[in-house]
């Protein structure tokens, strides 16, 4: 019988212990107490962070929104029908992140960055947090570079700059989305990346917008984020934040981006629904107390950041370049009531508003912008030199026209000066009309504004003004292509260019009768 040496036994045990694979992992687990309308109450989930991702059985995720003494209230991100009472769930230790990067351009994704356009997976290499702190005061720069929308009324009277927040507000079905889509189409070739966030809209409406962008070759520089009316309230609430994170990717690397939130009213409705289901105390119009903070923390992230910020963020890879994220939030009003809770909140947060009126839309003035109460708080600082020089008289003419038009209804005989002002105002109002998907370049806009300012429309019938404009632009393209190209490239305005414009209009008028 073989004798075992005690030292050998101890050696074998040591080897076994050394080769033993064991790992302990502490998991923070809880139990689902109730599931109602996409809201899940969880018991026993200690040390969970606000906004942390929670993993349920079946690979479904939720987000912690209410942290109470003995329970956690979470919203489910996806289909909650597989989650049942008594199931286990665990913390992930991660805040919600979405994919970011240029790979997303040309694609349609949901609020979590998952592709929904049937074009296969998106191979992004980076993700970023949905909730981020806006850049501080010290990292910001003043807004002084233009974002050309391509619409005469907006670029002339309410100029938008890179890094600005300009609200588009009005009733339903009066062209709010049309302005936003035109803005995206006009960025083709400008280097500005666009993000269109559709919140709570019909899937057919979103498909129509995507189709229009594809038709005009604008999808190559655009990301579309869709949280449709059939998506859970949590997705509609998160979509704008996800879009903002995708836009910040470009801003932080010294590029320019434009984001459109269509519309923030539906995001506020979704947030109200979530808050009421979480049993948070309701306030005015049943909105929770922090609905202002919901929109302010989102819109403050749109900014123009300094060269130092970009250099620091990119670790010195990008130098001497500013970055910007321009926001065009849309708010839907009920019967023109801008004094409701959400409209007043967003008006106070943004740097100006484009107010669209139903009466003007129904009268055929499209875009139906009311020039009297629409304003850009950045103003001329963000306009190109030529547009700034030529647009001054347009707002004045429209303001005087509105005042005199109201007065002339009661007065029977008007003096010649008043009649002249009224007629000029009528022509300018007609000139500000513009078809959808037909944005103008800087030079084309300058030519049209010059014709209005210098009284070249006086002898044109009001109903022929738009025909004259079309002929003018066509003639300029054929005969004065160099002048148009020069203004488009430089934005300059001087006596020589003014002479060319005058000569152009005179030649056109001499060539045919109006």
Curated annotation (Swiss-Prot):
One of its GO terms (cellular component) is plasma membrane. The keyword Transport applies. CDD domains: ATP-synt_F1_alpha_C, ATP-synt_F1_alpha_N, F1-ATPase_alpha_CD. It is a peripheral membrane protein. Pfam families: ATP-synt_ab, ATP-synt_ab_C, ATP-synt_ab_N. Gene3D superfamilies: 2.40.30.20, ATP synthase alpha/beta chain, C-terminal domain (1.20.150.20), P-loop containing nucleotide triphosphate hydrolases (3.40.50.300). The keyword GTP-binding does not apply. Its main location: membrane. It catalyses: ATP + H2O + 4 H(+)(in) = ADP + phosphate + 5 H(+)(out). The record marks 374 as: Required for activity. F-type ATPases have 2 components, CF(1) - the catalytic core - and CF(0) - the membrane proton channel. CF(1) has five subunits: alpha(3), beta(3), gamma(1), delta(1), epsilon(1). CF(0) has three main subunits: a(1), b(2) and c(9-12). The alpha and beta chains form an alternating ring which encloses part of the gamma chain. CF(1) is attached to CF(0) by a central stalk formed by the gamma and epsilon chains, while a peripheral stalk is formed by the delta and b chains. Belongs to the ATPase alpha/beta chains family. This is ATP synthase subunit alpha. It comes from Cellvibrio japonicus (strain Ueda107) (Pseudomonas fluorescens subsp. cellulosa). The gene is atpA.
């Amino acid at each position: 019988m073989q004798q075992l040496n005690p030292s050998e036994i101890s050696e074998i045990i040591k080897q076994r212990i050394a080769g033993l694979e064991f790992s302990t992992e502490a998991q923070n687990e809880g139990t689902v107490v109730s599931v109602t309308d996409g809201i899940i109450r969880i018991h026993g989930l200690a040390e969970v962070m606000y906004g942390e991702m929670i993993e349920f059985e079946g690979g479904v995720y939720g987000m912690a929104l209410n942290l109470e003494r003995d329970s956690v209230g979470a919203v489910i991100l996806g289909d909650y029908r597989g989650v049942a009472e008594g199931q286990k769930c665990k913390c992930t230790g991660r805040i919600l992140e979405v994919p970011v990067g240029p790979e997303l351009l040309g694609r349609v994704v949901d609020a979590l960055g998952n592709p929904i356009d049937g074009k296969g997976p998106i191979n992004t290499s980076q993700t970023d947090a949905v909730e981020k702190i806006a850049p501080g005061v010290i990292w910001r720069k003043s807004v002084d570079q233009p974002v050309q929308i391509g619409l005469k009324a907006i670029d002339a009277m309410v100029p938008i700059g890179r890094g600005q927040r300009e609200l588009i507000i009005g009733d339903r079905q009066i062209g709010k989305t049309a302005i936003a889509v035109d803005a995206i189409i006009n960025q083709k070739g400008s280097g500005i990346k666009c993000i269109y966030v559709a919140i709570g809209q019909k899937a057919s409406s979103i498909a129509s917008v995507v189709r229009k962008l594809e038709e005009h070759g604008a999808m190559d520089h655009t990301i579309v984020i869709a949280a449709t009316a059939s998506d859970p309230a949590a997705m509609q609430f998160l979509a704008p934040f996800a879009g903002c994170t995708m836009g910040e990717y470009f801003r932080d690397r010294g590029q320019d981006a434009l984001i459109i939130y269509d519309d923030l009213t539906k995001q506020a409705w979704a947030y109200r629904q979530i808050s009421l289901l979480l049993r948070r105390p309701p306030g005015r119009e049943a909105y929770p107390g922090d609905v202002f903070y919901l929109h302010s923390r989102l819109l403050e992230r749109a900014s123009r950041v300094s060269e130092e910020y970009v250099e620091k963020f990119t670790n010195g890879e990008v130098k001497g370049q500013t970055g910007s994220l321009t926001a065009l939030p849309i708010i839907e009003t009920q019967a023109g009531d801008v004094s409701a809770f959400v409209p007043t909140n967003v008006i106070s947060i943004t740097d100006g508003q484009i107010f669209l009126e139903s009466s003007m839309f129904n009268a055929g003035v499209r875009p139906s912008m009311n020039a009297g109460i629409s304003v850009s708080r950045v103003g001329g600082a963000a306009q190109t030199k030529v547009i700034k020089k030529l647009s001054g008289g347009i707002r004045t003419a429209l303001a005087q026209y509105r005042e005199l038009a109201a007065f002339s209804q009661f007065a029977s005989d008007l003096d010649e000066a008043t009649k002249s002002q009224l007629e000029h105002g009528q022509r300018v109002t007609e000139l500000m009309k513009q078809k959808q998907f037909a944005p103008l370049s800087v030079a084309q806009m300058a030519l049209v504004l010059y014709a209005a300012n210098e009284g070249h429309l006086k002898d044109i019938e009001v109903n022929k003004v738009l025909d004259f404009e079309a002929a003018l632009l066509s003639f300029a393209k054929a005969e004065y292509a160099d002048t148009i190209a020069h203004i488009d490239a430089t934005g300059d305005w001087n006596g020589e260019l003014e002479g060319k414009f005058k000569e152009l209009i005179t030649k056109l008028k001499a060539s045919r009768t109006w």
